[in-house]
């Protein structure tokens, strides 16, 4: 549709974003501003609503193809002598991964696949989560922990691949926080420079919108030392349940039910 806009009444064309639009462009490159060049909160919310409605452009057919491609790639690794363990993870509620990835105009944080723009759990996050749990349950300076995760001098023996949607699109959920005492939090933040303002009931809540996901993800671990890949998988299963992945785990986000798939350990 068309509508008059601007001080001269110029006509602008308004159309709904396609569900096939690139989420990498929309969430990482687009800056929605008003006629004064100021970032527009309403347009930012519209981008987030598009992400929820379109599921970040996830195509069931393409997801199936990517899953098949990964299966073939893992089969090649097995043929080369690698051990491969395949896991399936499902959030107990919602998952907030990549909220700190705010290198975009509207500071929308979410981990996205670098090619397709789908939600993922980065392999680096899975490795860090597993290493944190391993450190809790192992002796200090454990040789197994050092071998599996590496050190400053040597890389680890197990590779944690990015977790991708497990055969079907993940559900994208637009969530919201409502901090009630923003002046207090702002004035007491490091380097605020001003006098602290006490929290008070007359402070208005300030809604903060962010994206979360739910649904099954495929987790894959590979390595040449079978026992070490198995150990990493066991630690990851426990870490997902005990520590949770991503942000806001103290609020119930990120806890994962991780299970092993039936035919995962064939290797050459």
Locate each region found by the language model.
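Basic, Gly/Ser/Thr-rich N-terminal segments that form RNA-phosphate-binding interfaces in CRISPR RAMP
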Residues: 1-268
């Amino acid at each position: 549709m068309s509508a008059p806009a601007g001080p001269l009444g110029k006509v602008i064309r308004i159309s709904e974003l396609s569900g096939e639009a690139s989420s990498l462009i929309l969430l990482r490159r687009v800056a929605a501003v008003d006629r004064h060049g100021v970032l527009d909160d309403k347009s930012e919310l519209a981008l987030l609503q598009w992400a929820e409605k379109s599921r970040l452009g996830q195509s069931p057919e393409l997801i199936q193809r990517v899953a098949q491609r990964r299966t073939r790639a893992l089969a090649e690794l097995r043929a080369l002598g690698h051990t491969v363990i395949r896991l399936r993870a499902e959030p107990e509620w919602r998952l907030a991964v990549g909220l700190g990835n705010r290198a975009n105009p509207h500071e929308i944080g979410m981990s996205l696949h670098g090619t397709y723009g789908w939600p993922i759990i980065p392999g680096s996050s899975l490795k860090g989560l597993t290493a944190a749990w391993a450190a809790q349950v192992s002796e200090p300076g454990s040789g197994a922990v050092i071998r599996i995760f590496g050190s400053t001098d040597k890389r680890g023996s197990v590779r944690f691949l990015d977790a991708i949607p497990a055969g079907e699109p993940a559900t994208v959920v637009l969530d919201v926080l409502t901090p009630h005492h923003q002046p207090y939090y702002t004035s007491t933040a490091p380097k605020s420079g001003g006098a602290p303002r006490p929290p008070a009931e007359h402070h208005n809540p300030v809604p903060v919108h962010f994206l979360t996901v739910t649904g099954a993800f495929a987790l894959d671990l590979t390595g040449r030392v079978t026992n070490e890949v198995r150990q990493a998988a066991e630690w990851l299963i426990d870490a997902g349940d005990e520590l949770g992945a991503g942000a806001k785990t103290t609020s119930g986000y990120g806890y994962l039910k991780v299970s092993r798939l039936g035919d995962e350990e064939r290797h050459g």
